[in-house]
C-alpha cells in the first residue's frame, strides 16, 4: 500500500476547510484530549497546541463487503491451471474463525491516528460552551451612545474643520505640478537674457523677443490660482458607537499566612485560567485585581500573580474594597459586575458574619455573578457556611465550589462558567 505524506505548511490556507471539517467530525475525541491536557499541563503553558491521538478503529469509514461464511458462487478468470467451465473445490471450514495468536510474518494492522492542533484551536476547545452568566445590556436609553473620534483627512467637510497645513501643502503641490514647465522655461529665458545683455548688448531684437516671452511665461504662472477648491482638506470626525454591554471582573485572592505555597499556586492557576478566558472571549472587559490578608489592596496584574506579600486573614477587607471601587468607578446601572474569590476558608471567626452581611446587602444586589472557590482538602470552616446562606438568597447569581488539588481547577472552572440554557 502506498502513502502520500504532504509536508506543505498549508500553503495559502488551501486545507483550512478540510481541517475545520475534520475538527468538527472528531470534536468529542479532541475535547476529551484537551481536558486531559489541561489537567496535565500548567495553566501558564498555553504557548503551543496539543498532540491528539484518535484510535484507528474510530476513523474507519463504513464499507459494504461480503461477510465471512455462507455459500457463495463466484466467477474467476481462467489461468494456466484452470480453463473455462471448470469448478474449483470449495475449501473446508467456510466460517470465519480467529487465529491462534502466534506470531506471523504477514498481515496488516493500523496505528492510532495522531495529529497536532494549534494554540488557537486548543484554546477554542478549552473554552467552548463557557460564558459570563447573566450578561445583559446596561444603560439602555432607547438609542446607542456614540463618541466622536478623528478618522483622518477628508476632501469634503465643514469649513470650521478645515486643516490649514494640509490645505496649503496640497495647494503648493498643485501649483508646482501645473506651473513647473513654465517656471523651467522662465529660468532658461532669464538666463539667456542675462547672457545676451552681457555679451551682445546691441542685439536689441533678441532682447525684446526674450522680454516678451518672459512676460508671457510670468502671466501664465500667475494664472495658476494660489488656492483651489481641489486643495481644501478637512479633519474627518466620525461617531464611534460605545459598547452597550460593559463588564468588569473583580479578582479577590487570599494571600494570608494560612495559605500554603501549594494553595497559593492553585489559586494563581485558577485566576490565570479566568484571565485567559476573559481576554480571549471578551474584547472589552475590565479586570480589577485585589489581594488581601489583614488588609486589602488593589494591585496590577504583575503584582497580583507574583507578589510575595503575606499576613493575617480578614476576608471582609477585600469585600469592602470591592464595594468601594464599585461605588467609585463602576455605576451599577451601566456595568455588568462579576467577581471571583479564592481562599483556603480560614478567616478570623468574628469576620465571617461580616463577610456575609457585606455580600447580602452591599454587593450581591448589584452584581451579575459571584463565584467563591475554597482551596482546601480539609472540612469547610465558618466562611463556607456563611457563604452558603448567601447562596440560598441568591441562587442564580452566587456559586461556590471546592478545589482539593490542581487537577480540580479546570473541572471546577467549567462548572462555574458553563453556558446556561435560556428557556
UniProtKB/Swiss-Prot annotation:
Top-rank taxon, per record: Bacteria
Pfam families in UniProt: DUF444 (PF04285)
Compositional bias (Gly residues): 92-102
Region (Disordered) residue spans: 84-107
Similarity annotation: Belongs to the UPF0229 family.
NCBIfam families: PRK05325.1-2 (NF003707), PRK05325.1-3 (NF003708)
HAMAP family: UPF0229
Listed name of the protein: UPF0229 protein PSPA7_0730
Amino acid at each position: 500500500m502506498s502513502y502520500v505524506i504532504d509536508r506543505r505548511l498549508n500553503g495559502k490556507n488551501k486545507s483550512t476547510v478540510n481541517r475545520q471539517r475534520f475538527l468538527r467530525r472528531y470534536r468529542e475525541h479532541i475535547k476529551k484530549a484537551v481536558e486531559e491536557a489541561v489537567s496535565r499541563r500548567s495553566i501558564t503553558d498555553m504557548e503551543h497546541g496539543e498532540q491528539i491521538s484518535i484510535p484507528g478503529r474510530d476513523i474507519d469509514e463504513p464499507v459494504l463487503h461480503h461477510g465471512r461464511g455462507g455459500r457463495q458462487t463466484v466467477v474467476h478468470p481462467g489461468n494456466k491451471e484452470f480453463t473455462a467451465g471448470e469448478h474449483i473445490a470449495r475449501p473446508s471450514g467456510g466460517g470465519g474463525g480467529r487465529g491462534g495468536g502466534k506470531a506471523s510474518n504477514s498481515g496488516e494492522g493500523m496505528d492510532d491516528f495522531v495529529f497536532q492542533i494549534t494554540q488557537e484551536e486548543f484554546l477554542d476547545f478549552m473554552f467552548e460552551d463557557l460564558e459570563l452568566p447573566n450578561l445583559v445590556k446596561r444603560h439602555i436609553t432607547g438609542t446607542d451612545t456614540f463618541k466622536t473620534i478623528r478618522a483622518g483627512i477628508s476632501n469634503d467637510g465643514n469649513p470650521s474643520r478645515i486643516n490649514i497645513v494640509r490645505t496649503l501643502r496640497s495647494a503648493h503641490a498643485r501649483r508646482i505640478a501645473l506651473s513647473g514647465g513654465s517656471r523651467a522655461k522662465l529660468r532658461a529665458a532669464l538666463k539667456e537674457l542675462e547672457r545676451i545683455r552681457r555679451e551682445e548688448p546691441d542685439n536689441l531684437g533678441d532682447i525684446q523677443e526674450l522680454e516678451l516671452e518672459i512676460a508671457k511665461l510670468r502671466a501664465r504662472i500667475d494664472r495658476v490660482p494660489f488656492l483651489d477648491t481641489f486643495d481644501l482638506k478637512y479633519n474627518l470626525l466620525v461617531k464611534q458607537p460605545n459598547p452597550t454591554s460593559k463588564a468588569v471582573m473583580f479578582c479577590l485572592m487570599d494571600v494570608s499566612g494560612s495559605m500554603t505555597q501549594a494553595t497559593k499556586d492553585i489559586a494563581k492557576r485558577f485566576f490565570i485560567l479566568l484571565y485567559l478566558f476573559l481576554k480571549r472571549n471578551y474584547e472589552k472587559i475590565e479586570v480589577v485585581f485585589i489581594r488581601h490578608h489583614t488588609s486589602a489592596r488593589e494591585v496590577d496584574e504583575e503584582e497580583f500573580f507574583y507578589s510575595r506579600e503575606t499576613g493575617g486573614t480578614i476576608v471582609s477587607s477585600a469585600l469592602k474594597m470591592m464595594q468601594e471601587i464599585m461605588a467609585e468607578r463602576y455605576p451599577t446601572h451601566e456595568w455588568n459586575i462579576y467577581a471571583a474569590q479564592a481562599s483556603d476558608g480560614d478567616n478570623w471567626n468574628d469576620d465571617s458574619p461580616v463577610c456575609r452581611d457585606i455580600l447580602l446587602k452591599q454587593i450581591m444586589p448589584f452584581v451579575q455573578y459571584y463565584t467563591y472557590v475554597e482551596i482546601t482538602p480539609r472540612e469547610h470552616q465558618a466562611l463556607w457556611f456563611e457563604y452558603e446562606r448567601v447562596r440560598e438568597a441568591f441562587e442564580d447569581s452566587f456559586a461556590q465550589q471546592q478545589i482539593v488539588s490542581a487537577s480540580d481547577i479546570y473541572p471546577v472552572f467549567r462548572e462555574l462558567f458553563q453556558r446556561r440554557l435560556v428557556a
